[in-house]
Structures are given as structure tokens and as C-alpha cells.
Amino acid sequence: MSGALDVLQMKEEDVLKFLAAGTHLGGTNLDFQMEHYIYKRKSDGIYIINLKRTWEKLLLAARAIVAIENPADVSVISSRNTGQRAVLKFAAATGATPIAGRFTPGTFTNQIQAAFWEPRLLVVTDPRADHQPLTEASYVNLPTIALCNTDSPLRYVDIAIPCNNKGAHSVGLMWWMLAREVLRMRGTISREHPWEVMPDLYFYRDPEEIEKEEQAAAEKAVTKEEFQGEWTAPSPEFTATQPEVADWSEGVQVPSVPIQQFPTEDWSAQPATEDWSAAPTAQATEWVGATTDWS
């Protein structure tokens, strides 16, 4: 499909991205219309998708999207959680109209309802999950593009891009690749330079994992602030200027108390039957009398 043009050939970094995201890994079941997209089957029963066919169909889908004059007439739909973020990012990059979440029945066929819309091209993430828009597209002769796994039904699908449409990384990478090729064919970005948008922005993330990461980051920031607060110098608002005192002994007046001289006694000469409780009482009386000046 890419012809003999070297510019449209699949690069090595693209192959590495496909392999890292698991785009080549299909399911254990195989639809008869997807047989010519299969490269081989593993010993555990998983079918391996031929990435060369994936790249050719990706370029064909990009050419079909570029052929639409008004980018807003391209409808991109994903009812599954793994493709909703990728669909919104693709629409923001290419100007398409996204429908992330539940598709309202009758959007393409019921002219009475307020959500009625007539797009010129439909791109879905999963033909099995997005069967309602595919069925309505067949009623209004709307061309369709779909990311198809090995067990996906190809009914009402005009351009099937064989890939792993179950994994969050694979779905995000396929929408990123499709958006990049559309922008390259429009001339918005150059093929000589890599696209500055990373594929990680198209990946689905579980809200619970995001909350856990935010809580861990907040706890780490709090502990870091506490650690810095213990070792940093006190702020100037808490420092008070103290008067300079040349001699600290002059600042405090201590009352002078005469020191009494007690005769030295020979403890060995006292009898062993002496009452020890009487001696402290007499001394305590003297100390009380000596310290009357303090009061």
C-alpha cells in the first residue's frame, strides 16, 4: 500500500513502538475475514498480527481521513475506556469530532433528536463494542474505519486496521500513529523531524492509579518540607534582639548571706547508739534561722 516510496515505509523506531505496546499480539480466536492479516500462531494459541499489513492499512486510513475537506466531518468514537482518552487527543490534534463514552442511538439516523449529525467518515476503536454506530453508518452509506483484532467482525467495516484493540497501550499507540500520519499527509508536521507529542499522552490511565500516585507525591512533598524545616535556620520574624550585657554578674543581684562556720567533728568518736534523727532537726533549725533574709 505504501508503494515504492521510501518516505512511506515503516521505520525501525515504529516497529519497536509496535512491539513494546503489544500491537502485534492478537487473541486466541480468529475470524475468517482476518486470516490474511495473521503472520503466525504461538504455542499458547495467541495469533501474531503481521505488522506490515497493519502499517499499510494505517496509511490507507490516514489517506481517507485527509481526503475529507472539513476535519470536523470526521467522527471518531470509542465506547470503551481504553480508547476514550486517545480519541479525545486525536480529535484535538486533527480537528475531528469525538464521541467518547456511550453512543446515543439514532445520532446518524434519527433527524428528530437534537443530537442528530451527518458525518462524512466514521472511525471506531472496536467493531464489537461500537456496533451501534457501525450499524447506523450502514443505513446512511457512511464509510467506516475500525481498529480490528483477530476475532473482530468485519461487517460494515470498510477499512480494517489489524492490531490489538484490547490493550490500553496498543490502542493509544494506534491512535497516536494515525494522528501523526494524518498531520504528515496534511503537511502540518515534517517527516524529517520526530513529532514532539509523546504516545504516552494517548494511553488510558486508571483513575485509582492516578489518585494513588498523587497521594504518594503529596506525602513525599510533606515529608520533604518537614525535613527541611527541622534543619533550616529560624526565620527573622521569630528572632528577638537581646540587650548587650558586658558583665552578666552585674545584671543579677544576689543577696549576701553570711556563711556559717561549723566546727569539724570526729565522727569516729561519737557513740554508735546516737539518734540520727535528732541531728538533722537541730541543723535544719539553724538553716531556717539563717535564711530568714530571703523572704
From Swiss-Prot:
Region (Laminin-binding), start-end ranges: 161-180, 205-229, 242-295
One GO cellular component, as annotated: nucleus
Region called Disordered, residue ranges: 218-242, 266-295
Highest taxon listed in the record's lineage: Eukaryota
Residue numbers spanned by region Interaction with PPP1R16B: 54-113
Biased composition (Basic and acidic residues): 218-227
Modified residues annotated as N-acetylserine in this record: S2
Localization terms from the record: Cell membrane; Cytoplasm; Nucleus
UniProt family annotation: Belongs to the universal ribosomal protein uS2 family.
Assembly information from the UniProt record: Monomer (37LRP) and homodimer (67LR). Component of the small ribosomal subunit. Mature ribosomes consist of a small (40S) and a large (60S) subunit. The 40S subunit contains about 33 different proteins and 1 molecule of RNA (18S). The 60S subunit contains about 49 different proteins and 3 molecules of RNA (28S, 5.8S and 5S). Interacts with RPS21. Interacts with several laminins including at least LAMB1. Interacts with MDK. The mature dimeric form interacts with PPP1R16B (via its fourth ankyrin repeat). Interacts with PPP1CA only in the presence of PPP1R16B.
Name by which UniProt lists this protein: Small ribosomal subunit protein uS2B
Source organism (scientific name): Homo sapiens
Gene name per UniProt: RPSA2
